[in-house]
Regions:
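Local beta-strand N-terminus motif with an aromatic residue
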Residues: 6, 51, 74-75, 87, ...
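N-terminal Rossmann-like NAD(P) cofactor-binding module of classical short-chain dehydrogenase/reductase
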Residues: 10, 78-79, 101
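Short internal alpha-helix immediately C-terminal to a glycine-rich phosphate-binding loop
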Residues: 1-29
Length: 203
């Protein structure tokens, strides 16, 4: 999405593993980060990882809040792993020439995009499916793209080594706890990620 220093990044699902990473990467790149997160514990996690502002979509109008925080301009880049209503609101609070990065649909609803909104504000919507780069399924990235992914990982590791990325582990479970972990994720009770650890009662 070519996020530049001084731009505004809106991160949906900011208390999830990818959302928290997006908040930290945005801050490391010099962006002003606005996060959406439901509940005070998740909002606190987003702030702790670098969000300047947190909006609770269960209690606030996301579009109105983003426009208010940006002086009516909107967000330059939107990171969206949620889809559904949050994607709909993002379309209406993205700045002219803005970019929306869609990586998943945790809400359970794949949004439909009114193309006229893209046209009148010159907005780009960018899809990112990780399996394409990892050669899952029939579609595979070219060697040149895979080389680019290695470069990006090198940048991420450099940020981690510099202390700018702090992966959040909600809890560790044995492999036999997979169903419990999945249930917690589905119930939206997780901040960061759940790690399944081989061994213990799985030995």
């Amino acid at each position: 999405a070519a996020l530049a220093p001084g731009e505004t990044l809106l991160v949906h699902g900011a208390a999830g593993a990818s959302g928290l990473a997006a908040v930290e990467i945005g801050r490391a790149l010099g962006a002003e980060v606005i996060a959406t997160a439901g509940g005070e514990a998740k909002a606190a996690a987003a702030r702790a990882h670098g969000a300047a502002h947190v909006i609770d979509p269960r209690r606030e109008d996301v579009r109105a809040a983003v426009l208010d925080l940006t002086g009516g301009r909107g967000a330059d880049v939107v990171f969206d792993p949620v889809g559904g209503d949050l994607f709909d609101s993002a379309l209406r609070c993205t700045a002219p020439l803005g970019r929306i990065l869609t990586i998943g649909y945790a809400s359970g609803r794949i949004p439909q995009i009114p193309a006229n909104l893209l046209l009148v504000k010159n907005i780009s919507v960018i899809g990112l499916y990780w399996g394409f780069y990892m050669a899952w399924g029939k579609t595979r990235a070219s060697p040149a793209l895979r080389a680019k992914v290695r470069e990006m990982f090198a940048e991420l590791f450099a940020l981690f080594e510099a202390g700018k990325l702090h992966p959040e582990v909600d809890r560790e479970l044995p492999l036999s706890g997979f169903a419990e972990g999945l249930r917690r994720v589905q119930d939206r009770g997780v901040i960061g990620k759940i790690v399944l650890v081989p061994g213990g009662d799985d030995a």
